[in-house]
Amino acid sequence: MIKGIGLDMIDLERVKQVVEKNPRFIERVLTEKEIKQFEKYEGNRKIEFLAGRFAAKEAYAKANGTGFGKHLSFTDVEILQVEDGRPHVTLPANAGENVFVSITHTARSAAAQVIIEI
């Protein structure tokens, strides 16, 4: 049964400006494991990775119906690339959900869609 569907899109230039102004933004959005994947990239690909993860986490919060705040933070949701290249969502052990995520990029933006199944 589908619990929710979320969609988010973000401008790459906006993410780049935020990171330039506040580099700690990366640590607020990404988990330690995600940061290790992020650090493997160079230049604009880093911004694409960060923006894609940000959009995916926002899409998750929308699909969950909670948004981010008191009960959910960006680092509660971890999205890692698995061996075949797909993004895989890891949640706290008590979540009891199946989460499907798709992330895409253009030259100017990143977008993600999340479907939560219970």
UniProtKB/Swiss-Prot annotation:
Name the chemical reaction catalysed here. Answer: apo-[ACP] + CoA = holo-[ACP] + adenosine 3',5'-bisphosphate + H(+)
- Annotated residues that bind Mg(2+) are located at D8, E58
- Cofactor(s) this protein requires: Mg(2+)
Pfam families with a match to the protein in the record: ACPS (PF01648)
Protein localization: Cytoplasm
Tell me its family.
Belongs to the P-Pant transferase superfamily. AcpS family.
Q: Which HAMAP family match?
A: AcpS
Please report the name of this protein according to its UniProt entry: Holo-[acyl-carrier-protein] synthase
Q: What organism does this protein naturally occur in? A: Listeria monocytogenes serotype 4a (strain HCC23)
